[in-house]
Amino acid sequence: MSLFDAARPNPAGFKDLSPAELPVPLPEGVRLIDVREPHEFVGELGHVPGATLVPLATVPAQAVSWDRSAEYVMVCRSGGRSGQAAQALVKAGFGKVMNLVGGMLAWNQAGLKTEK
């Protein structure tokens, strides 16, 4: 079963994952996209190991070259911006998009590993 298949449906068309449901290292074929700004990515909250920084404003332009068959997990500080990014990917035709509920705040609260 893929990570996407195990995730919970969200009414916006993507799926939701809790920090405990996101395995690190990431399974093959899963891309973790952090949509925060560069200073947040390396700041106090750090980032999930394996995450790629793609600030929210640049997601539509960068997603043009992404593999639409891959699974994507979007993350931000609290889940709001990543939810917007997930919704944008769904509208652009991506079929396997997930949002990390609670973002890096929830990730840190769960005591999970981060990088800076």
What kind of region is each of these model predictions?
Residues 1-30, 38-72, 80-116:
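Rhodanese-like catalytic fold shared by cysteine-dependent sulfurtransferases
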Residues 75:
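Short, surface-exposed ligand- or partner-binding patches at beta-edge/loop junctions that are enriched
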